[in-house]
Curated annotation (Swiss-Prot):
Cofactor comment: Binds 1 FAD per subunit.
Organism (species): Polynucleobacter asymbioticus (strain DSM 18221 / CIP 109841 / QLW-P1DMWA-1) (Polynucleobacter necessarius subsp. asymbioticus)
Keyword Oxidoreductase: yes
Binding site for FAD: 37, 45, 50, 90, 125, 290, 331
SUPFAM superfamilies, A to Z: FAD/NAD(P)-binding domain
Name assigned to this protein: Ferredoxin--NADP reductase
Subunit field text: Homodimer.
Catalytic reactions of this protein: 2 reduced [2Fe-2S]-[ferredoxin] + NADP(+) + H(+) = 2 oxidized [2Fe-2S]-[ferredoxin] + NADPH
Keywords of the record: FAD, Flavoprotein, NADP, Oxidoreductase
Lineage of origin: Bacteria, Pseudomonadati, Pseudomonadota, Betaproteobacteria, Burkholderiales
Family: Belongs to the ferredoxin--NADP reductase type 2 family.
EC annotation from Swiss-Prot or TrEMBL: 1.18.1.2
Length: 348
């Protein structure tokens, strides 16, 4: 261990909607949390998989996008000062002799926490990669699975692979900035917003971009620079295409990953919990959201919010066994109003 661990009362693994709401529920009980996520921004599946698709089953919110839900949750938890540690995967979780939990991440950051909340969805998301020998040497140089700096593609010959929202969104965004944009998909059928598909076809018809149906089967590189790719169609015909940068959007593959090595009871790649505390088989470790399993489990954001509330109360009792944990309401409690930074209402 290179650095002294950050000591905490609570560490939340996963910054999706349920992990964010876990911050809120803990905050109401005066428990401050650190949040760790392997993705570069908060939001989990909502941001990575469907940022602009409508969600209709959030109570009292007739419709919102994944991005809007994430933004609202981040605003809701602002009063509680959670510290975020993004872009790093939790690799190790070990119970210490004093009962505390030592958490280690891929960035060699360590935490020593009294409680841990695993809100990792279906596990850590990893991009599905292009399966060509030696291609990994070009990653983050000329082959990208995430776009962090879109300006770097200006004036370049860009090839984008994929048939979902990410592929089409970036194709439409870069078509006016890049020297050329070619979209490659294995079939002429796209799982993206209808408006995006229509716009893409319009741009192809006017020769402002190109669509190729097929798969990349080989490539040529020189001095760590991508020079050319070869696309093979369904009939076996090949076409060579010059390229500067290649953007791959084959989707994200959820992997349980290191969680499987933490000594927790697992059933069908999910963590077994009780439905009173949502505690795992190790005291002080809770699992909420899609990562857990119990009789009658439904993988809904709404269900995850409920689980986060009960897990927070369980953790409060675990952290303060001699203290009676009072249920207070945000409508009437001056204490909660102070924590939330709002004034207590007056009633005539």
């Amino acid at each position: 261990m290179l650095h002294s661990p950050i000591e905490a009362d609570a560490v939340i693994i996963g910054a999706g909607p349920v992990g964010l709401f876990q911050v809120f529920e803990l905050g109401l009980l005066e428990i401050k949390a650190h949040v760790i996520d392997s993705l570069p921004e908060a939001g989990g599946q909502c941001i990575e998989l469907y940022p602009d698709k409508p969600i209709y089953d959030i109570p009292a919110v007739p419709v919102c996008t994944g991005r809007e839900l994430t933004q609202n949750l981040l605003k809701q938890i602002e009063p509680f000062g959670a510290q975020f540690h993004l872009g790093q995967e939790v690799r190790t979780l070990e119970q210490q002799a004093d009962g505390r939990l030592l958490i280690g991440t891929s960035q060699n950051q360590y935490f020593l926490s009294k409680t841990v909340f695993i809100a990792a969805g279906v596990g850590a998301f990893q991009p599905r990669k292009l399966a060509l020998e030696g291609i990994e040497a070009l990653e983050d140089k000329h082959i990208f699975y995430h776009v962090k700096h879109p300006e770097q593609f200006s004036g370049k010959k860009i090839v984008i692979c994929g048939g979902g929202d990410s592929a089409l969104d970036w194709a439409l965004f870069l078509v006016e900035k890049a020297a050329s944009v070619t979209l490659i998909h294995r079939r002429d059928d796209f799982k993206a917003a209808p408006k995006s598909i229509a716009k893409m076809r319009e741009l192809c018809a006017s020769k402002q971009m190109q669509l190729l149906i097929g798969q990349i089967t080989s490539y040529e590189a020189q001095d760590d620079h991508l020079k050319e790719i070869v696309v093979t169609d369904i009939d076996g015909k090949t076409q060579a295409l010059p390229v500067d940068d290649l953007l791959i959007f084959f989707g994200l593959s959820p992997k349980l990953g290191p969680i499987a090595e933490w000594g927790l009871d697992i059933e069908r790649k999910q963590l077994v919990v009780d439905t009173e505390k949502f505690q795992t088989s190790i005291p002080g470790i809770y699992a909420v959201g899609d990562i857990n399993i119990y009789p009658g489990k439904k993988k809904l954001i709404l269900s995850g919010f409920h689980e986060a509330a009960l897990a927070a109360f369980a953790a409060a009792a675990y952290l303060n066994p001699e203290k009676q944990i009072q249920l207070q309401y945000t409508t009437t409690s001056p204490k909660l109003h102070k924590a939330l930074g709002v004034g207590s209402p007056t009633f005539e």
